[in-house]
Amino acid sequence: SLVGSEMCIRDRVEIMIPAVSDIAFTPDASFYIAHKLMKKGAKIYLFNGGFHHSKIMMVDSTFCTVGTANLNSRSLRYDYETNAFIFDPKTTNELNAMFERDVQNSTLLTPEVWKKRSGWKKFVGWVGNLMTPFL
């Protein structure tokens, strides 16, 4: 899980993850972690417009990072991936606008949406969560 996830309660944190993936059981593991963050106060959007593979973060309309690095143990330790750190309000606001457009093609993860998932999907997500150090 993300370090400092309790900050979601105090600060506005919005996360978009793909509703589908190119890797089996990845959405279930992602949903499991997203559900935990949702319970802490983060808004989680499930992107329905296809497979969304971007790794972008915008902070306070002044700073953003864009790149290929996944925030998981394997990528941070072993993979040769990188992100650009951009300190430019104009670029950050353009990315914010793109995010807001993508929100229109997304489903907000709510307790009701979570409850509609089958027990099997929840179990697969739990197992996937246990395996995240190896993914």
Show the residue positions of the predicted features:
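Short internal beta-strands
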Residues: 13-19
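Short, small-residue-enriched loops and turns at beta-alpha junctions
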Residues: 22-25
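A transmembrane-helix-recognition feature enriched in membrane-embedded lipid enzymes
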Residues: 116-135
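Short, surface-exposed patches at the edges or C-terminal ends of soluble domains, predominantly
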Residues: 110-113
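HKD (HxKxxxxD) catalytic microenvironment of the phospholipase D
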Residues: 44-103
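Glycine-centered short loops/turns at secondary-structure junctions
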Residues: 10-12, 41, 61
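Short, small-residue-biased leader/transition segments that mark boundaries at the very start
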Residues: 2-9
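Structural recognition of alpha->loop->beta junctions
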Residues: 32-46
